[in-house]
């Protein structure tokens, strides 16, 4: 499975591509950071991110895009910009029929390091080890994008099982409702 990991941001947006093999075997295929000037207009910054992400999607053809879910930070402007960048990325993927999944920072840290409170240095060290990279990915946005892709690769089987179980439960509930309504109608 090819997974594009994205650490969204307006100033720096980390992009990565990982391919999963048997078991927990992973191969890093590409990683980059899209940068936009902080003094540029918001629309221009989002357009630059969109153009870069669309190029990645059209070049690498991932099956899934894993994006970091934005949580409350102290700076509301930063949160809004990050969320807007994430929305542009999700839209670009959706337009191409590529599945999009969001993962929380603590979920990613736990998947990669075993500790949901790990710091950036620990995440970077584990990403380097897991992917057998020759050097640590820099800046942190690149390492975070790789960590997101790793997290999704390792969680994908669980996500698929949960979706299948939910679908079966919904189908059973619909059948039960149909049977109940038929019983009510027959009782009239």
Curated annotation (Swiss-Prot):
Its EC number is 3.1.21.10. It is an enzyme of class 3 (hydrolase). It comes from the Bacteria. GO terms for biological process: DNA damage response; DNA recombination; DNA repair. GO terms for cellular component: cytoplasm; Holliday junction resolvase complex. Mg(2+) 2 binds at residue 68. It catalyses: Endonucleolytic cleavage at a junction such as a reciprocal single-stranded crossover between two homologous DNA duplexes (Holliday junction). It is found in: Cytoplasm. Keywords: Cytoplasm, DNA damage, DNA recombination, DNA repair, DNA-binding, Endonuclease, Hydrolase, Magnesium, Metal-binding, Nuclease. The active site is at 7, 68, 141. Mg(2+) 1 binds at residues 7, 141. One of its GO terms (molecular function) is crossover junction DNA endonuclease activity. The keyword Lipid biosynthesis does not apply. Its cofactor is Mg(2+). Binds 2 Mg(2+) ion per subunit. Pfam families: RuvC. The RuvA-RuvB-RuvC complex processes Holliday junction (HJ) DNA during genetic recombination and DNA repair. Endonuclease that resolves HJ intermediates. Cleaves cruciform DNA by making single-stranded nicks across the HJ at symmetrical positions within the homologous arms, yielding a 5'-phosphate and a 3'-hydroxyl group; requires a central core of homology in the junction. The consensus cleavage sequence is 5'-(A/T)TT(C/G)-3'. Cleavage occurs on the 3'-side of the TT dinucleotide at the point of strand exchange. Belongs to the RuvC family. Homodimer which binds Holliday junction (HJ) DNA. The HJ becomes 2-fold symmetrical on binding to RuvC with unstacked arms; it has a different conformation from HJ DNA in complex with RuvA. In the full resolvosome a probable DNA-RuvA(4)-RuvB(12)-RuvC(2) complex forms which resolves the HJ. This is Crossover junction endodeoxyribonuclease RuvC. It comes from Mycobacterium tuberculosis (strain ATCC 25618 / H37Rv).
